[in-house]
């Protein structure tokens, strides 16, 4: 035991005398030895089937050395992490190798990227570099504005260049263009073939120009007149709009109405012998006046065209020629008001009684001049007539009940009621 303790002390002193420079290498070697022994021991344990490891028991000094190196390595790692960060001394040679490998790989990648460029891109780069080197001084030429005097008189005709040579430039092309034959040849000497073709072409152009002018002239006139009409149709003020908005006048209805009223007046004079009392006539005038008002309103709504007036006149004639049927109401006495219309005249002509064979002298009847007074009287009489109807209705019902055989048998009705 004393020998073993001396060996362990000497080994510990030997470890403490190791310099700090070789400390990292020693740590790496110790770790490698430790790993190899662990693997070796695991293999021996698997082969022996659970036998004890004799090497660990035989060499306790090596175990102590390994423990000391591991503890020192942990202590140095904690100090380096606190002072310098994550950098570790024991792994420094490995990190240096990795950084060198990374640099080499980045250089290779750059080379491959340059080689991946296509030929077109390389050509474009070369062209851009070529154009950048070019220095072009492009400047516009300066034009000098020189004002030259141009003598022009007020009555002078502008001179144009002659298309034809001297003997032919005096030809009146407009006059010769519409000649039936080639009279221009007689006016001048016969020209050469080329000049003759040029003269013929100029004459043809003159002819075409004249035809186009004649064709476009009516179009210009039509457009001018249409614009003038459009300007005239526009109302100049609000008064013109008001006059257009007014209802159109009825030109021929008044003449038709007057003629119809006169004819009806003659008929009524002939048939006045079979007239009724004045009260019934006033009733008839009131009802006919109401009808005439409604018909006049309907007539005013209609348009006053000549065709419609002609149709109305034909209807009036047909109604006069038709057979006259008697009506329940008496004929109408003519009034001073001009409210008689065409439909009213038609109704009167249909409702007149047949003519009597014996001539009867007319009976003059007096009517109020104001139509308002005329309308007031029959209204009151109408009301009285209605009251009399209501009063007589009860007696009529009683009389009808008395005529029934059942009531007569019972003796409820008096003999006077039965009569």
Swiss-Prot record:
InterPro entries: FAM217. Coiled coil: none annotated. Residues 1-60, 96-119, 236-299, 317-382 are annotated as: Disordered. Residues 252-261, 271-281 have a biased composition (Polar residues). It comes from the Eukaryota. Residues 7-19, 236-251, 282-296, 334-345 have a biased composition (Low complexity). Belongs to the FAM217 family. This is Protein FAM217A. It comes from Mus musculus (Mouse). The lineage of its organism: Eukaryota, Metazoa, Chordata, Craniata, Vertebrata.
